[in-house]
């Protein structure tokens, strides 16, 4: 029997995106979509947190006070620096309160300094050491960190699943476009319920 596992990667579930006073809360215009996907993700974590064939991993993005990790940033990374978002040890960089009840079940891999969860982290090494062959992506932002991490995982040889109801874009249109047109180029697009069905729990 295969011992390979699925890693549920939680991306961007930090106060600067989700808290009402978060610096980048306004970047997610589709608030209802964001709230729905958060509820779906919490339900999914509840379903898989005790399964031996699943790992739940968080990869928060954090920067030092002078953003020395960023060399002439552009795009969203420039916005992060200019607005002072995701500063290490700041309230905005912390994982949102909704996940606190799962603190013993979620492994946090630190070091992320860019859009890709594999960048500047030991994520790949950890996944291979723990026999992970499939990565399921949940979080924000669909067109940025989700897409970047998904492409990188695919290039590294992992099977990639993007969870359509556990991810959120800046707008509803962006979310739908990526799920319909972009993600299928390198990944499987599933709902959380479909993920559970395609990876049913196997009794010992």
Label the model's feature ranges.
Residues 1-7, 17, 46-53, 69, ...:
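Active-site-adjacent betaalpha module
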Residues 13, 61, 165:
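Active-site loop/turn elements of alpha/beta-hydrolase fold enzymes
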Residues 16-30:
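Glycine-rich N-terminal loop/short-helix segment of MobA-like nucleotidyltransferase
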Residues 27-39, 80-90:
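A short acidic, glycine-rich active-site loop
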């Amino acid at each position: 029997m295969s011992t390979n596992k699925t890693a549920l990667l939680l991306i961007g579930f930090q106060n600067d995106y989700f808290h009402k006073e978060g610096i980048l809360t306004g970047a997610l215009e589709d608030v209802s979509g964001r709230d729905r996907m958060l509820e779906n993700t919490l339900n999914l974590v509840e379903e898989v947190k005790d399964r031996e064939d699943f790992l739940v991993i968080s990869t928060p993005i954090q920067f030092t006070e002078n953003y020395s990790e960023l060399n002439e940033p552009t795009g969203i990374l420039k916005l992060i620096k200019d607005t002072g978002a995701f500063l290490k040890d700041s309230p905005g960089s912390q994982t949102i309160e909704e996940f606190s009840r799962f603190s013993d079940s979620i492994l946090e891999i630190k070091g992320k300094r860019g859009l890709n969860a594999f960048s500047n982290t030991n994520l790949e090494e950890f996944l291979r050491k723990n026999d992970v062959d499939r990565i399921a992506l949940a979080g924000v932002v669909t067109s940025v960190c989700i897409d970047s991490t998904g492409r990188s995982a695919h290039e590294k040889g992992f099977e990639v699943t993007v969870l359509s109801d556990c991810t959120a874009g800046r707008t509803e249109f962006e979310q739908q476009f990526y799920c319909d047109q972009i993600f299928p180029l390198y990944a499987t697009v599933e709902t959380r319920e479909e993920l559970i069905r395609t990876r049913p729990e196997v009794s010992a």
